Amino acid sequence: MSATTAEFFRATHEEWGVEFDFNHGLASIDGKDGRVVGVTTDDGRTLPADVVVYGIGVIPNTEIAEAAGLAVSNGIEVDERLVTSDPDISAVGDVVSFPCAQLGGAMTRLESVQNASDQARAVAARLTGDGGDYRTLPWFWSDQGHLKLQIAGVAHGYDHTVELPAEAGQKTVLCIKDGVLVAVETVNGPADHMIARRLLAERPELSPEEAAAEDFDFRAWADSRVAVGAR
C-alpha cells in the first residue's frame, strides 16, 4: 500500500477514536483473577486493556520445507511455475516466495486470499497438463467500517502517487514506478478497481505529469490502453 492511502486510513481511524502507538512492543500482558487487565510496553508504560488481539502470521512457517531440504529465503522459494528446488514438490500461498511478473520477476511473498487461491489453481492446471508460468495480477481488499479498500497490482518501489478527483466518500490513487502504472488503490471505488485489474497486467506506461493533468480521464485512458492491447 502507498503512503498516500495508508495515511488516509490512519487519519480515518483516528477520527473514529483509534489511538496508534507505533514503534513499541509489549513487555508483558498483565492479568488479574484469570482476566487481562492491561499491557506493559517495552518502554515501561502500563495501558489498561479488556481485550488483547494478537496479530500473527507475518513470519512464514518454513520448518517443514527446511526439513525437506528445500531452498528457503523469506518463504519457500519457487520458480515461475511454482516448483520448489525439488522438481517433485510445488508450493503455493502466503509462505511462498515467487518471481512476481508485475515486479519484473523480483522474488516476492504475498499474503492474500487471491494469490493463494490462484496459485493453487495454477499448480492444479500444470499437474493436469494445462498450465504455464504463474503471471496472475495480484489484487487485495479490506473492509474497514464503511470503507472498502481494493488494490490492484503491487505498489512495491513506486516513486510517484497521483490521487484522482473523486466523489465524496471515494478515492482512487495511482501508483507509478519508472513511468509505468504498477498499482491502483481505491476506496469505495469498485469500477476503477475492476478497470485496473483488466489493465495492469500490460504494465501500461503513464507519467506522473500526465496522470496529474486536469483533463486526465482515467477510465477513457484505460479503455484506450485495453483496446490497443487487444489488437
Question: What name fits each language-model region?
Answer:
Residues 167-229:
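C-terminal auxiliary extensions adjacent to catalytic cores
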Residues 1-28, 115, 136-141:
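Rossmann-like dinucleotide-binding cores of NAD(P)H-dependent redox enzymes
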Residues 21, 40-41, 143, 176:
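A general beta-strand register signal
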Residues 28-35:
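Feature captures the FAD/FMN-dependent oxidoreductase FAD-binding
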Residues 14, 18-19, 70, 125-132:
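Generic secondary-structure signature for well-ordered alpha-helical cores
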Residues 35-40, 45-118, 122:
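FAD-site-proximal beta/loop scaffold in flavoenzymes
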Residues 30, 40, 78, 175-177:
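Hydrophobic alpha-helical segments, especially N-terminal targeting/anchoring helices
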Residues 95-194:
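Mid-to-C-terminal Rossmann-like scaffold of FAD/NAD(P)H-dependent oxidoreductases
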